[in-house]
Amino acid sequence: MGCALHPKTLRPKVTNMKIIPIVPMTKKQAATVCGSLTSTSKMPCKSYSLPTEACITGFKMAQIPGSICSLCYADRNFYKMYENNIKPAQFARLDSINDEYWVSGMVSHIGNDQYFRWHDSGDLQSLAHLEKIAAVCAATPATKHWLPTREYGIIKDYIAKHGKDSIPENLIVRLSAMYPDKPVNVPVSLQGVPGVTVSNVHTAQAMGNACKAPAQNGECKDCRLCWSDAVVSYALH
């Protein structure tokens, strides 16, 4: 396959970001490179999942009783019921992140979809991983991307390396809460950074805009707040 830049690539706002050429490929080729995408019943779009066992901060938090990660939905319910099918696919995706054509594969998968969610299971693995996701976002300007994460340190490293205006305009990075009813404490270096917002988890009173899904049969329906810079609060589930 010959290399060619996407004609409508949305560049990050800084000049020190490495430009990754996008190699055109079919959906079948994309699946071979980076695995398949996932579909969840409540979401209005495709999503991408990794194994929770690979979570860095999440794995540590899961050992703390009462933390959100200790109650992780991705280790229960639908995911647990079908783990014999889901887990191998998730680990295959994890292995594929280092593939030189991973960015191209994800760009092909996403295409011109209006919305996309990163990590309905799992989380960021490294600064290089986040840089690749940013490259995917830059190469899919028609798509609004939502990236929830507890890897605050990786986000801080990204901003320190590339600058406060380096998050692609079509990407929302949502710092996720560690505990129910305790709002996210945004690191000083990430305060006021365009594209960075938070999500909290509540048992009673919402801390921000309450997610509407519980009142809508667990579905987003026409709500797209998670793809905005608004603070969102999810009911503990």
PLM regions and their residue ranges:
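Class I S-adenosyl-L-methionine
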Residues: 3, 10-237
